[in-house]
């Protein structure tokens, strides 16, 4: 809760500010197209001719990176912007474009991906469709249900995603047939990174050097953990030459020092996966002529209070409803959000979401919250001001939060303050990343999620995965996420309907039902919606923003110039 004060102290360290630079908000996401957008400029068509290449560009990030090799989540997200090329990218209008591969489909069931001309691995070997197939098979062998169903130790079955595939004679195209049509399949490919078959095949382990063979415009030159730097240089095998010769990622332990470095010109931009500049820093940065801000309409959910619907206090829907009316959303929006922040709907997903429905706004209503507490059996308050049931037990729960995410801790503290003032006791469980994952994720808990409630931030990519609308975080059967532990048949039936959609109109119908379900049952709460505010040095021009990876995207390095 000290973030506002800390951010304001940065003012004393700034040089005298003149004015803020900004950009107009991007439009909302459009429905995905089965073909590449014809009227949207590609990065190649849009890139200017720079007066001279940029020798070195430094990106600040607070991402925790330990090994800098393929398979480390935070590194993979970072490297997706430089070396680990996804199949496609999504622009800020919500439209998809080829990156590593072009794509096509006739029926939303069989999707064909064709490797772009001239694409090679950094060791000189060509990228082929067999690399895509190998990656899917490798993931299958490591727990993903790509071509065969997977059964967990507890008997939970994840059905296979694909029913089959074909590869073209020239090995450059693969056609993947889904178990059921998915008009939104491209959203899953914005973060799908391909592995080199010739490196990994037949090996249980690979060396760090082998793990760093990639197919993007850059290759990893060095990782200095002590200095906190990750350096990428141009991949000479890439078919096009970017404007930036070298990209250095500077790892920071906290946001305060990172933003100060941006103001002082020590770094050129800041980046966090699917997250913009926190509202507590935006006023400070907006007043600095050395910093430019760009506002991007976002499809993520930056601040989520998720309930465990299967264990603990919040198996009782009345208590989830009570919390939904007891919270002060205007306080979250004002304190943590930007000037574009909004109070969310009870339907959870923001208006940029494909299939969005305008459900009722979340409101603060103590009398309604009190009615729901009484319906749950908590009719009186004790001497400490907390609701108690007939057995004299206080309404209390433990709220789990990742200690490494300062803003998330701020959300948790504000929830505790507000709910305890209302009459629900909140015990904060502030833990490290590993302990947090073990309590909040099916994958890392081995299908034994123990949190009663937790603070999450859902990425735009995650919100769109599976059936979309954040459903992977709600579905208790999801192999990786499933934090809300919802196994309700009504919910499952809606997911089946969405999965079976053969047209975008069919999908919209199912999406509307899912938002109505969220609004009626409150398995989770969005504390506020917001655009993403991205920050970079005012010395840069012609920056390109990606809907998934923000400023840290491959196309940016081909467009960005120095003023």
List where the protein language model places each region.
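Aromatic- and charge-enriched surface segment that lines or borders ligand/interaction sites
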Residues: 102-145, 175, 313-315
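Detector for C-terminal structural segments
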Residues: 326-356, 407-416, 441-563
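Gly/Pro-rich hinge or "lid" segments in bacterial periplasmic/extracellular proteins
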Residues: 93, 189-242, 246, 366-367, ...
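Extracellular/periplasmic solute-recognition and catalytic clefts
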Residues: 139, 145-147, 166, 221-233, ...
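N-terminal lobe/hinge region of extracytoplasmic solute-binding protein
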Residues: 60-107, 137, 213
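Surface-exposed binding/hinge segments that line
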Residues: 149-200
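Append "and occasionally in soluble cytosolic enzymes with long acidic Gly/Pro-rich linkers
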Residues: 233, 315-417, 562
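Ligand/substrate-recognition segments at binding pockets and active sites
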Residues: 225, 379-457, 532
């Amino acid at each position: 809760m000290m973030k506002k004060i800390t951010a304001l102290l940065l003012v004393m360290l700034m040089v005298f500010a003149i004015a803020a630079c900004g950009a107009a908000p991007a439009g909302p996401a459009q429905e995905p197209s089965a073909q590449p957008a014809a009227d949207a400029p590609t990065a190649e068509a849009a890139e200017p001719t720079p007066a001279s290449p940029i020798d070195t560009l430094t990106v600040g990030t607070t991402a925790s990176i330990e090994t800098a090799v393929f398979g480390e989540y935070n590194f993979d997200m970072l490297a997706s912007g430089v070396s680990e090329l996804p199949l496609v990218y999504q622009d800020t209008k919500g439209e998809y474009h080829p990156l590593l591969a072009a794509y096509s489909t006739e029926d939303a069931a069989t999707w064909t991906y064709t490797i772009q001309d001239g694409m090679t691995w950094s060791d000189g070997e060509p990228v082929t469709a067999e690399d895509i197939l190998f990656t899917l098979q490798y993931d299958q062998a490591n727990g993903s249900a790509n071509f065969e169903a997977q059964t967990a130790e507890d008997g939970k079955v994840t059905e296979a995603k694909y029913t089959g595939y074909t590869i073209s004679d020239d090995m450059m195209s693969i056609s993947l047939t889904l178990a059921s049509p998915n008009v939104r399949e491209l959203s899953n490919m914005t973060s799908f990174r391909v592995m080199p078959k010739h490196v990994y095949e037949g090996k249980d382990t690979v060396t760090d050097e082998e793990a760093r063979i990639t197919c993007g415009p850059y290759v990893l030159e060095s990782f200095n953990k002590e200095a906190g730097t990750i350096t990428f240089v141009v991949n000479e095998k890439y078919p096009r030459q970017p404007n930036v010769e070298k990209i250095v990622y500077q790892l920071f332990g906290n946001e305060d020092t990172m933003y100060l470095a941006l103001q002082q010109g020590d770094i050129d931009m800041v980046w966090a996966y699917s997250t913009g500049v926190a509202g507590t820093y935006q006023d400070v940065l907006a007043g600095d002529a050395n910093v430019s801000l760009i506002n991007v309409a976002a499809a993520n959910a930056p601040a989520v209070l998720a309930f465990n619907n299967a264990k603990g206090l919040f198996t009782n829907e009345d208590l989830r409803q009570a919390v939904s009316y007891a919270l002060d959303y205007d306080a979250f929006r004002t304190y943590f959000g930007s000037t574009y922040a909004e109070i969310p709907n009870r339907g959870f997903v923001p208006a940029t979401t494909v299939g969005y429905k305008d459900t009722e706004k979340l409101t603060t209503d103590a009398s309604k919250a009190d009615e729901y507490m009484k319906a749950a059996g908590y009719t009186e308050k004790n001497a400490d001001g907390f609701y108690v049931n007939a057995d004299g037990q206080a309404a209390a729960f433990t709220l789990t939060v990742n200690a490494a995410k300062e803003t998330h801790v701020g959300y948790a503290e504000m929830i505790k303050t507000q709910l305890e003032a209302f009459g629900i006791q909140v015990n904060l469980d502030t833990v490290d990343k590993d302990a947090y994952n073990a309590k909040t994720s099916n994958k890392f808990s081995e299908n034994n999620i123990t949190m009663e409630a937790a603070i999450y931030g859902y990425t735009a990519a995650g919100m769109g995965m599976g059936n979309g609308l954040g459903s992977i975080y709600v579905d208790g059967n999801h192999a990786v996420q499933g934090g809300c532990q919802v196994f309700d048949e009504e919910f499952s039936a809606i997911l089946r309907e969405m999965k079976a959609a053969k047209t975008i109109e069919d999908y919209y119908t199912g999406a509307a039902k899912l938002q109505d379900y969220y609004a009626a049952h409150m398995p989770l709460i969005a504390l506020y919606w917001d655009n993403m505010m991205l920050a970079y040095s005012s010395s840069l021009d012609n920056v390109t923003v990606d809907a998934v990876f923000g400023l840290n995207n491959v196309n940016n390095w081909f467009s960005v110039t120095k003023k």
